[in-house]
Structure formats: C-alpha cells, structure tokens
C-alpha cells in the first residue's frame, strides 16, 4: 500500500499538462473524453475481476464506472449546448484537442526512485494487453463523441471550422487503421505496488 501512496504523491507533485491551457471549450472536450475513457477502463477491470472471482473489486469498479459515465454525460451535454451557440469556435477547440491527442493525467506516472514518466508506457502496455484500455477503445470514444455532438450535422461553420470538421470526421477511421497495426510488446512488467497473484 505504501508504494501506491508514493506513486500517487509523485503524480500530484509532478503535476500534468492536459493541453487545454485556460480554454474552457478545450477543457470540456478533455473531460468528455477522459471521463468516458475512465468509464471504459473501470468497466473492463470490473469484468476482468468478476471473471477472476474477485467480486468486491468488480463491484467497486462498477460503482466507479457509473460515476465516470455520469460525469461524461454532463460534460458531453455542456459541449452539445456550446455547439448550438458557438459552433465554429467549439469545432476548432475539438479539432485542436484531437489533433494533438488527449493525454491522460497519469502520463508522468512513476514509482519510488523512478524518473518522471518512466512508468506510463509500461503501465499502458499492460493495460492494453490485459484489455483494460486499448487503442480500439480510444477509436470508439472518438466515434461516440462525434455522434453525441452530431458533428456531421452542425451548420453555420466558418471555412476554417469546416476544415476542422472534415478532419474530425475522418480521424476515427484513420486511427482505427493505426490501431490495427499496433503490436503490443509481450513483455512482463513488475510494478512495486502490485504483488503477482501467484
């Protein structure tokens, strides 16, 4: 448990930059995506835990997943309403966030005595291999956001925002092709805050 605390304290003290600056539109894009991603990952962990006979862990993750979905729905609704009153600026903010990729707060993840960010890639590989959160989940989230905000039906856009929309409409398909080519390394990673179930 101490190593979990150390990792958490490092994460807090190292801070993170989610790429939104002080732009409220970008912040809402970030939270809409991030909350859906955490819903997906907690829901997947719940399934894995249930399959492994860890009912309490599964139940806890389901509860957290439910909270994440409620947050996602709220932020998604904020953006839907912003699109109604400021479609071009909202489209450009969405475009900027997706073009430069949504980064998770844990990108600087590290263990005790580790370098900043030294753990995130390993953690991501394990999560992808275990089916907790995959590149296909990322693609699915893009598709869901495009559908939730009716990106293809928004009117009154500037020419710049129209170009942004065209990019956003093609992005999920492009990312899906990339996801199909990704090979997750079959390496074993040991984390200080996890004991093998052996």
Predicted features, each with a name:
Residues 1-198:
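Non-heme di-metal
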């Amino acid at each position: 448990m101490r190593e979990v605390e150390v990792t958490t304290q490092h994460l807090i003290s190292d801070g993170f930059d989610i790429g939104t600056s002080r732009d409220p539109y970008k912040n809402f894009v970030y939270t809409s995506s991030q909350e859906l991603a955490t819903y997906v990952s907690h829901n997947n962990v719940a399934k894995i835990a249930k399959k492994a006979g860890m009912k309490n862990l599964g139940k806890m993750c389901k509860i957290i997943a439910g909270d994440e979905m409620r947050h996602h729905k709220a932020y998604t609704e904020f953006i839907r309403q912003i699109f109604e009153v400021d479609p071009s600026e909202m489209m450009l903010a969405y475009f900027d966030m997706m073009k430069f990729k949504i980064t998770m707060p844990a990108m600087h993840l590290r263990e005790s005595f580790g370098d900043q960010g030294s753990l995130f890639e390993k953690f991501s590989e394990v999560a992808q291999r275990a089916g907790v959160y995959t590149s296909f989940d990322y693609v699915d989230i893009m598709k869901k956001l495009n559908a939730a905000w009716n990106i293809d039906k928004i009117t009154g856009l500037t020419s710049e925002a129209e170009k942004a929309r065209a990019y956003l409409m093609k992005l999920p398909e492009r990312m899906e092709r990339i996801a199909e080519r990704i090979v997750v390394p079959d390496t074993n990673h040991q984390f200080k805050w996890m004991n093998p179930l052996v």
